[in-house]
Amino acid sequence: MAPKAEKKPAAKKPAEEEPAAEKAPAGKKPKAEKRVPAGKSAGKEGGEGKRGRKKGKKSVETYKIYIFKVLKQVHPDIGISSKAMSIMNSFINDIFEKLAAEAAKLARYNKKPTITSREIQTSVRLVLPGELAKHAVSEGTKAVTKFTSS
C-alpha cells in the first residue's frame, strides 16, 4: 500500500509545478526526482490500471457463465435472477472447497504430495450423498476420458 501512497502525491505534485518552480534550487531537484517517478508512475498507473483491472477480473472468478450454459441445456426457456445466480455460484465454490479439502486430507493420509483424479473421485464419494456421488463420479470419469483422448 505504500507504493500507492507514493503515486498519489506524485500525481498531485505535477499539478503544483508552478509553485514548485518558484523554489528554484530546492524545487528543481525534487522536481526532477518527482517527474521521473511521476512519469514512471503515470506509465505504471496506466499499465497497472490495465493490469489492475485484469487482475481484478482474474481474482473474481465465477461460474456464472457455466451455470447459465447448463441451465440453457436443461431448460432453454427459463432464466435466472442475479441473486439466484450468486447463490448458485456460492454453492459451487463451497462444494469445490469441500472436495479440495477432502482430497488434500486423502493425499496427506497416503503420504503423497500430489492430488490425482483418484483422490478427487474418492473425495466426491465421501462428500456427496448416495446417488448424487454415483452420477458425479460417472460424469467426471467421462469428462476425464474425453479430455485425455482429445
Curated annotation (Swiss-Prot):
Residues 1-16 have a biased composition (Basic and acidic residues). Belongs to the histone H2B family. It is found in: Nucleus; Chromosome. It comes from Zea mays (Maize). The modification N6-acetyllysine is found at residues 7, 34. Core component of nucleosome. Nucleosomes wrap and compact DNA into chromatin, limiting DNA accessibility to the cellular machineries which require DNA as a template. Histones thereby play a central role in transcription regulation, DNA repair, DNA replication and chromosomal stability. DNA accessibility is regulated via a complex set of post-translational modifications of histones, also called histone code, and nucleosome remodeling. It comes from the Eukaryota. GO terms for molecular function: DNA binding; protein heterodimerization activity; structural constituent of chromatin. The keyword Lyase does not apply. Can be acetylated to form H2BK6ac and H2BK33ac. Monoubiquitinated to form H2BK143ub1; may give a specific tag for epigenetic transcriptional activation. There is a cross-link at residue 146 (Glycyl lysine isopeptide (Lys-Gly) (interchain with G-Cter in ubiquitin)). The lineage of its organism: Eukaryota, Viridiplantae, Streptophyta, Embryophyta, Tracheophyta. The keyword Acetylation applies. One of its GO terms (cellular component) is nucleosome. The nucleosome is a histone octamer containing two molecules each of H2A, H2B, H3 and H4 assembled in one H3-H4 heterotetramer and two H2A-H2B heterodimers. The octamer wraps approximately 147 bp of DNA. Gene3D superfamilies: Histone, subunit A. Pfam families: Histone. Signal peptide: none annotated. This is Histone H2B.2. Keywords: Acetylation, Chromosome, DNA-binding, Isopeptide bond, Nucleosome core, Nucleus, Ubl conjugation. InterPro entries: Histone-fold, Histone_H2A/H2B/H3, Histone_H2B, HISTONE_H2B_site. Residues 1-57 are annotated as: Disordered.
